[in-house]
């Protein structure tokens, strides 16, 4: 790789060297963007608190976001936390834009999962939790809207432990220190032995358990009233760990976008070494074709504004111009490519256009949109002379229609959708798994039978609990 560290003199990106990327995730309407606003205000990054209902928040800047009051596109803001330089990434909470959220997880060092104290753990929260586990992201929880009547802190903590993880621990200052230490010690056998020996737990111990995803610090408050937000930030500063990076250059591309002038932006995190302006970058396209290009600009975005720098060092998230072959999930330099995403659309639609629109020209115009929203999986069906796309739901369809109309001046319709893939068995089938290493023996039979149409999936076991305990029969 030809990107190497150069002269860092007078480069604002070079100091300080402690960088951390924190993501905000939530079920829609949990108050995630309001929390982002409160964090930026407390740390002095903005002078005035905006509100989602007033359509003036710092990060939800797109007209469609402000009109709907939801986050559609992931955004970032820069702030300082002690001697750390923080990039705060606000992700969509609506399930229709969850693929955009998942792309951002690739570059996070830790996450804050925002939960509504009025609603508790909702279904999408469990999906987010599984994703955080898959990407091995240390996670803090902020239980928001505790100013609303009827919120029950103890019941909420019980729900978090039952539906997410028993390692969710209340870090509120009003609880007994002894009870808090005992609960922490229960999360790790090594720590329990240490606690029983000397009766103490150090901050570094908690930091280790948080990094290992054995402890998930929980903070309560109200983002709208700026209550509890300072304690959350103190907890992150005390217990989050800064990653260590190699000297060899590497970068992970997590998003492709375009600025107001239409310039292509490659959003990436430098995962090793240093990325410099005008230095050659090498990679391979999705089709496997090798390429070599130079970066024109390196931008550090905060909201809609940005600062241009000459280099981005390991740990920094930036947007780069001049690259035309990059794609979301691509690894550059020593960084490997990402695994395939978990969240994919379940519906496919045929696009329809007015009679005077050349469909071949429309297809060429829309192809760049797939770079920004790769889950569209845009397909040209030559035999039917039509364009098909995959989407997550009705809200995304409305947003896409607005986006295509505004950017390409094209009216587009989405015909009746169909399931991307659906198949069921037609007859009974039995599979057998046999396992017989030294001193062990097991044989499992799995019987699949077709059910009534629309009956869904049903599971049962006929193995007696006298032979095998129920805990070992969970499907």
Predicted segment positions?
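Structural and coupling elements of P-loop NTPases
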Residues: 1-475
């Amino acid at each position: 790789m030809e990107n190497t560290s150069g002269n860092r003199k007078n480069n604002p990106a070079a100091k300080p060297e402690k960088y951390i990327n924190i993501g905000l995730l939530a079920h829609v309407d949990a108050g995630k963007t309001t929390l982002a606003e409160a964090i930026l205000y407390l740390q002095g990054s903005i002078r005035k608190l905006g509100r989602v209902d007033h359509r003036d928040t710092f990060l939800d800047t797109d007209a469609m976001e402000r009109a709907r009051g939801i986050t559609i596109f992931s955004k970032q803001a820069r702030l300082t936390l002690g001697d750390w330089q923080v990039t705060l990434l606000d992700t969509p909470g609506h399930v229709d834009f969850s693929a955009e959220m998942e792309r951002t997880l690739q570059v996070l060092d830790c996450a804050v999962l925002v939960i509504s104290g009025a609603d508790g753990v909702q279904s999408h929260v469990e999906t987010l939790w599984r994703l955080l586990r898959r990407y091995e992201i240390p996670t803090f929880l902020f239980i928001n809207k505790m100013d609303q009547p009827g919120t029950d802190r103890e019941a909420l903590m019980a729900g978090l432990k039952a539906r997410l993880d028993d390692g969710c621990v209340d870090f509120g200052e009003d609880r007994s220190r002894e009870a808090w230490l005992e609960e922490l010690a229960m999360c790790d056998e090594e720590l329990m032995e240490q606690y029983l020996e000397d009766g103490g737990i150090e901050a570094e111990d908690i930091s280790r358990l948080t990094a290992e995803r054995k402890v998930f610090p929980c903070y309560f408050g109200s983002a709208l009233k700026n209550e509890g937000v300072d304690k959350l930030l103190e907890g992150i500063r005390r217990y989050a760990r800064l990653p260590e990076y190699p000297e060899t250059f590497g970068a992970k591309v997590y998003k492709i976008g375009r600025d107001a002038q239409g310039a292509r932006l490659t959003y990436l995190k430098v995962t090793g070494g240093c990325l410099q302006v005008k230095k050659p970058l090498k990679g391979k396209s999705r089709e496997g074709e090798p390429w070599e290009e130079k970066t024109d600009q390196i931008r550090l975005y905060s909201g809609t504004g940005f600062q241009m720098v000459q280099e981005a060092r390991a740990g920094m998230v930036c947007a780069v111009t001049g690259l035309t072959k990059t794609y979301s999930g691509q690894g550059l330099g020593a960084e490997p490519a990402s695994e395939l995403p978990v969240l994919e659309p379940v519906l496919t639609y045929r696009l329809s256009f007015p009679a005077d629109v050349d469909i071949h020209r429309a297809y060429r115009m829309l192809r760049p949109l797939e770079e920004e929203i790769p889950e569209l999986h845009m397909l040209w069906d030559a035999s039917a002379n039509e364009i098909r796309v995959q989407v997550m739901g009705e809200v995304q369809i409305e947003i896409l229609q607005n986006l295509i109309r505004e950017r390409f001046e094209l009216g587009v319709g989405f015909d009746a959708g169909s399931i991307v893939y659906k198949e069921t068995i037609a007859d009974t089938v039995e599979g057998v798994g046999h396992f017989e290493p030294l001193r062990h023996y097991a044989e499992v039979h799995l019987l699949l039978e077709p059910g009534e149409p629309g009956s869904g999936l049903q599971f049962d076991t006929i193995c007696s609990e006298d032979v095998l305990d129920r805990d070992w029969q969970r499907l």
